[in-house]
Amino acid sequence: GFDVVFVCEGGAFEELTRLFERRGAPVRDSSDDDLRFRFLVPVGRTVDDPTIDSSSFAATAWFQRRWDAIGPTLTHGLRLKPWPRTEQRIADAVAAAGLAAAGWERRRAVVLLLGPGARNGGDLTSDEAVRFLVALRVPLFVWSIGKSPSPETWDAATAIRTAADFDVAVARLRADLRRQRILWVEGAHLPQAVALTPLAKGVRLAR
């Protein structure tokens, strides 16, 4: 199966809602993939405790739907209240999404949706969040939503300016996840302690 966690920055949510309001009928997905996806909002609530300092993020339940339902679920199926853009803990939320995606023995990914005015106000930097996901072996995809790129220092390899662009990005995400394979390694090992030898031809660790 496939598990995908989307971190949706506020500006990206507004841009996608606008794009999907004026789109035509999407191409129907006839696949029978076992897909689950959820959305996480990068606004954290810090919990101070004598022994621990942690942050929680608003997240939806897992949706078990087709690939073509991702965009409509986000833009029409959720009731999200506006939140201050200056309080977005984007990198922190990406790290939390990585933990959520890695929680099950399934093919997985985190997708960060960035709008034009995205600003990170969290404790982690983008580089620190990326390194954390690499250690977890969770691939990260960054999609830039709208005509202007985000000023944040994420490697947004995918630009989305129309609803059709979103469909193409989802198709590429699905193709990448379908290439993932899960191997069981005997014993108890930290993910970052597992490495490939030169004999592993045509194989790379997910990151």
Task: List where the protein language model places each region.
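Scaffold/interface architecture of coatomer-like assemblies
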Residues: 1-207
